[in-house]
């Protein structure tokens, strides 16, 4: 391996990493011994190692989150668990590694009696001979986490690392560095007493009781469990152990809480420290009688892969005042001593407890320890009471004490193989299911397309029929009006031909649709038939299983095997309980997520309500502003706002109605699917009968075809014989004729003979033709026979293929049913979780109903207000109309004045006309707004009806939930009673079996044995009946689960619909805000137009006043002129002057009275 980089972060590790090391030179932890490299005397030669020694470094996920290195050595493969720890920054230096394995010392210490060493180690003493090579303090100890192999017989090595020379003196920081394998070197301060010669037979004296008592509270036994046993047992003993490892691997502490493992010898001698020239010292060397340390792994860190960028092995630091530890383990297992009761939760597994109970020197204290460990394991994550947990712990302890490890390993391997087979079958079945579903979906899509085509054809047919009716009516009219009837009849005939063609097309489409429907029904029927056959086979299998169980119970020799099976079932139950607890946690997390979603929805609702309030405040502010400016603009804006609000309400009502319709469609679809299923079953039965009939007809037809062939074959030789006879006769006749011809030379006789020859030749030709015909017919019959035989063989092959497919499907269905039965235990707890969820949904639905009722009340109040505002606006509109009429009258008067005075008045008239057109557009808009108000009122009524329908649906859902709950409670009580009866029966059976076993030991059988056997049979019958009742209860529970799932699905759909409605409302509110802004702009524009009109009116009034002043001035001038004329002229002209004066008066009166006339108009 390359040196580890310090820049990258340590990757997380969740599995097992195994590294096979060919030689300890590749992954050593210290300097080689010069004396060893020079010469070897004793056990091991120079440069080589014994082939019996080997080692494997395995990185395994620990029980409580700690990683381990499993070190193996020797022929028996003993293993030692060592904790691994990660380091955030790594600096690697390639160390020089020793050549011999350091593990035999520990093995011998274990085999000779688990003794603790005495004495201390002087770091200045170095081994001087190869006999002391194994006990060198520079060697790696077995518990330092650096695994290596020695020997040339290891075939799995993939890499070989060349050791590099280190400096003769290293600092303490160098001791913390990593080797090439990514493992940290071990630091050790003290090692045991002197050697005894070879370094392979060191003995450990027994420890004192005082040392054990002082040492107990300082020991952490979490990291010293035998990991190979855990892997072999928890890998196949059910799903419980793997779940524990994975769950605890996800909850590891951080890197900052690392605690280095402690050395045992460092406690006895705190003053001694390792020299700078020995970075890794072997505490297990036999030459110094080193103590075996127990690595303290209180706070594990997050681990990566062994030898990667971010992983290392825990450093064995020299800590003072640590006392030597003791071994109390059998040769195969390295187990810790009794842990103190102060540790509340210790990761002890049932396999570790079993290995501890098998040891010879364990007493009552170890039994208590195992019980306490089981209690701690069961207590983690459980909700049950302490008494129940204690009972379970005692039962598990009693069971595991009597079970043997080899039997469990065999059963575990069998279970593993069965599980793998079941998983493979399950995947195959799932693939088949997916294929069938895809085919069904494709058929349904084709059905939909055909239906669409059919509907299109029907629509075309209707159009053509309508055209035909129109043509017939036109024909009648034309017949009545025009004499050209022939052409019309021809047209009618063409139309009828087209209609017939369209009918034929329609029939074809209908036939194709029916064929597709038949195919679909056939597929569904086949599926249903397979399901029914699977159920029947399941019942037959259950009966066979019950018979086998009876035979096993009758045999007294298999009592011990049945006990072992019961214990295995208990283990499975415990594993299933752990899995159920994990599912409970998952359901709790889901409930928390739903609560978060509900809180977010409430927040969004509150935001929407705040936005509504802000809109209302804006509306009030707009109303106040409009009151200040003008009443007309205010009323228009209010109308627009109300219209937009009504539109939004109408849209909401439509959405609710659509949701109700969708729900009704779903119900109708489910009903239709049920009806289709019943129809499919009937069609399947009909098809089966048809197939049987067709098979019979085929067999009859084959027999009929064979009979004429046989008859033809019998006839053919007869016809050949007849032909041969006819040929023979003809030859005889020809011979006769030739004789006669030779005897009679007359011409008449020669003619007769020629005629006879001709007739005979024609007869020969006819006979040959008949023979050829018969041969052709024979060949045709043979061909037909061969074709029939081929068809028959094809039918047989298809039949065999179908039977094989049916068998495969039946097997797969059996497997699925078995898996479903195993999953029933999981569904029971899910029902409880669903009940709690149902209660939560019920509370939520009540709250949502209350909110909806409040919202409906608020909307009703708003509608009433809007109606009142509409009335006031209508009154204001009428007043505005009156004002508009007065304005138009004033404009007309001004127009007349302008026509009389100047062209400027004409321009003003054009502008007034444009104003009139805008007023007509406004009146049209007002009418449209009134129509919209009416439509909104209608939509409001529809929304009220939809709300009532929703309330009725919610009441129905509540009633269904109550019914389901009552049924669940009844089934639970029944199930509890059945379980109690079953446990009582099992106890009775055990007592009876124990009695039978006692009676079997006696020499003479008594009548009591037969009585006991009869009782056992009766109890077994009772157990069978109870199992049947339990199956019925499970079926009912499945139905209830389905109902609950349907209810939850409907509730989820309604919740989603409410969320969509809320989103749409928020969008509608935004649109209303935009409309408000637009209406405000229109109001401002209208106000500008009004001001402009008022200005123009004022200008016109000013002009009118100016004209009036001019007219008055002209009157005064006329009067003055008349007075001057009267003084100058005589009396003769007085009458003429008076007439002129009257004329001027009339002109002024016309000018002054013109506005009055216009107003009257």
UniProtKB/Swiss-Prot annotation:
Alphabetical GO biological process terms: microtubule cytoskeleton organization; posterior lateral line development
UniProt feature, compositional bias: Low complexity: 189-203, 742-751, 1124-1134
Main location: other
The family this protein is said to belong to: Belongs to the cingulin family.
PANTHER family: CINGULIN, CINGULIN-LIKE PROTEIN 1-RELATED
Name of the protein in its database record: Cingulin
Residue pairs linked by disulfide bridges in the UniProt entry: none
InterPro entries, sorted: Myosin_tail
A Pfam family this chain is assigned to: Myosin_tail_1
Protein keywords: Cell junction, Coiled coil, Tight junction
GO molecular function: microtubule binding
Gene assigned in the entry: cgn
């Amino acid at each position: 391996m390359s040196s580890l980089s310090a820049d990258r972060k340590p990757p997380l590790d969740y599995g097992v990493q195994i590294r096979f090391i060919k030689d300890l030179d590749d992954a050593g932890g210290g300097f080689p011994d010069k004396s060893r490299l020079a010469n070897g005397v004793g056990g091991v030669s120079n440069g080589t190692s014994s082939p019996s020694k080997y080692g494997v470094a395995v990185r395994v996920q620990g029980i409580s989150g700690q990683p381990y290195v499993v070190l193996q050595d020797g022929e028996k493969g003993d293993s030692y668990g060592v904790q691994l720890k990660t380091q955030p920054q790594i600096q690697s230096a390639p160390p020089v590694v020793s050549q011999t394995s350091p593990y035999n010392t520990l093995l011998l210490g274990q085999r000779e009696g688990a003794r603790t060493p005495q004495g201390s180690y002087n770091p200045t003493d170095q081994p001087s001979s190869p006999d002391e090579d194994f006990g060198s303090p520079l060697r790696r100890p077995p518990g330092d986490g650096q695994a290596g192999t020695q020997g040339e017989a290891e075939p799995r090595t993939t890499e070989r690392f060349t050791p590099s020379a280190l400096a003769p003196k290293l600092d303490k920081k160098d001791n913390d560095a990593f080797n090439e394998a990514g493992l940290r070197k071990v630091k050790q301060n003290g090692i045991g007493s002197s050697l005894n010669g070879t370094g392979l037979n060191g003995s450990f004296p027994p420890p004192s009781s005082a040392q054990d008592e002082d040492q107990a509270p300082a020991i952490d036994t979490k990291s010293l469990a035998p990991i190979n046993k855990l892997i072999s047992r928890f890998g196949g003993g059910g799903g419980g152990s793997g779940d524990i490892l994975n769950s605890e691997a996800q909850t590891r502490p951080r890197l900052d809480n690392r605690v280095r493992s402690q050395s045992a010898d460092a406690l006895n001698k705190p003053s001694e420290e390792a020299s700078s020239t020995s970075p890794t010292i072997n505490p297990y060397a036999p030459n110094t009688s080193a103590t075996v340390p127990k690595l303290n792994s209180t706070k594990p860190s997050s681990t990566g892969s062994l030898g990667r960028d971010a992983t290392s092995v825990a450093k064995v630091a020299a800590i003072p005042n640590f006392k030597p530890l003791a071994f109390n383990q059998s040769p195969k297992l390295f187990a810790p001593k009794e842990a103190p009761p102060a540790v509340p939760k210790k990761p002890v597994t049932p396999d570790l407890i079993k290995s501890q109970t098998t040891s010879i020197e364990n007493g009552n204290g170890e039994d208590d320890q195992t019980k306490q460990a089981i209690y701690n394991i069961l207590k983690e994550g459980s909700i049950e009471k302490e008494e129940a947990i204690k009972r379970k712990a005692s039962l598990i302890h009693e069971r595991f004490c009597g079970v043997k490890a080899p039997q469990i390993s065999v059963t575990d391997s069998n279970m593993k193989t069965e599980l793998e087979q079941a998983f493979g079958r399950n995947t195959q079945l799932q693939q088949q299911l997916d294929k069938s579903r895809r085919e069904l979906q494709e058929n349904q899509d084709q059905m939909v397309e055909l239906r669409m085509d059919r509907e299109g054809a029907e629509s075309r047919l209707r159009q053509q029929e309508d055209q035909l009716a129109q043509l017939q009516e036109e024909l009648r009219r034309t017949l009545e009006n025009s004499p050209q009837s022939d052409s019309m009849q021809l047209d009618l005939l063409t139309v009828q031909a087209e209609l017939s063609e369209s009918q034929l097309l329609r029939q074809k489409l209908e036939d194709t649709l029916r064929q597709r429907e038949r195919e679909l029904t056939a597929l569904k029927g086949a599926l249903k038939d397979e399901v029914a056959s699977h159920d029947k086979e399941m019942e037959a299998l259950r009966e066979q299983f019950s018979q086998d169980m009876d035979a096993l119970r009758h045999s007294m020799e298999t009592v011990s095997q049945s006990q072992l099976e019961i214990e295995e079932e208990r283990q499975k139950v415990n594993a299933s309980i752990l899995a159920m607890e994990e599912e409970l946690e998952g359901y709790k997390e889901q409930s928390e997520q739903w609560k978060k979603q509900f809180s977010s929805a409430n927040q969004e609702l509150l935001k929407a309500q705040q936005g509504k309030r802000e809109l209302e405040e804006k509306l009030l502010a707009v109303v106040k502003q409009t009151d200040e400016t003008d009443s007309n603009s205010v009323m228009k804006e209010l109308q627009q706002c109300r219209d937009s609000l009504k539109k939004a309400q109408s849209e909401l009502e439509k959405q609710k109605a659509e949701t109700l319709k969708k729900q009704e469609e779903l119900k109708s679809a489910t009903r239709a699917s049920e009806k289709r299923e019943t129809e499919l079953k009937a069609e399947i039965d009909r098809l089966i009968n048809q197939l049987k009939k067709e098979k019979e007809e085929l067999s009859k037809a084959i027999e009929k075809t064979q009979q004429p062939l046989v008859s033809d074959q019998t006839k053919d030789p007869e016809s050949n014989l007849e032909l041969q006879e006819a040929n023979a006769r003809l030859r005889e006749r020809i011979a006769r004729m030739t004789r006669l011809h030779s005897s009679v030379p007359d011409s008449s006789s020669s003619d007769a003979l020629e005629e006879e020859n001709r007739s005979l030749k024609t007869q020969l030709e006819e006979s040959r033709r008949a023979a050829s015909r018969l041969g052709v017919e024979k060949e045709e019959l043979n061909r037909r026979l061969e074709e029939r035989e081929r068809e028959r063989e094809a039918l047989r092959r298809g039949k065999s293929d179908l039977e094989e497919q049916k068998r495969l499907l039946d097997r797969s269905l059996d497997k699925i049913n078995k898996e479903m039965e195993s999953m029933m235990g999981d569904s029971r707890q899910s029902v409880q979780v669903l009940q709690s969820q149902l209660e939560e949904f019920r509370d939520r639905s009540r709250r949502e109903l209350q909110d909806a009722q409040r919202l409906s009340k608020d909307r009703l109040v708003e509608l009433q207000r809007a109606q009142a505002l509409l009335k006031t606006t209508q009154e204001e509109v009428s007043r505005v109309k009156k004002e508009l009429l007065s304005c138009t009258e004033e404009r007309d008067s001004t127009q007349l004045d302008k026509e009389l005075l100047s062209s400027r008045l004409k321009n003003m008239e054009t502008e007034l006309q444009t104003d009139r057109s805008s007023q007509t557009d406004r009146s049209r808009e007002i009418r449209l707004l009134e129509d919209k108000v009416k439509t909104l009122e209608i939509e409001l009524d529809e929304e009220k009806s939809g709300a009532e329908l929703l309330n009725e649906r919610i009441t129905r859902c509540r009633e269904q939930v109550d019914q389901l709950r009552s049924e669940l409670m009844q089934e639970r009580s029944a199930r509890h009673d059945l379980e109690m009866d079953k446990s009582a029966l099992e106890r009775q059976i055990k007592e009876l079996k124990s009695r039978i076993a006692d009676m079997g030991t006696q020499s003479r059988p008594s009548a009591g044995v037969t009585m006991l056997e009869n009782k056992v049979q009766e109890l077994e019958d009772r157990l069978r009946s109870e199992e049947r009742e339990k199956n019925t209860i499970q079926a009912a529970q499945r139905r209830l689960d389905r109902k609950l799932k349907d209810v939850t699905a409907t509730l989820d759909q309604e919740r989603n619909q409410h969320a969509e409605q809320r989103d749409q409302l928020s969008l509608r509110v935004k649109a209303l805000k935009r409309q408000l802004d637009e209406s405000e702009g229109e109001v401002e524009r209208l106000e500008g137009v009004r001001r402009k009109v008022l200005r123009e009116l004022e200008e016109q009034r000013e002009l009118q006043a100016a004209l009036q002043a001019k007219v008055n001035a002209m009157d005064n001038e006329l009067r003055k002129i008349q007075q001057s004329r009267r003084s100058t002229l005589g009396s003769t002209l007085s009458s003429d002057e008076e007439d002129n004066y009257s004329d001027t008066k009339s002109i002024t009166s016309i000018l002054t009275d013109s506005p009055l006339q216009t107003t009257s108009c």
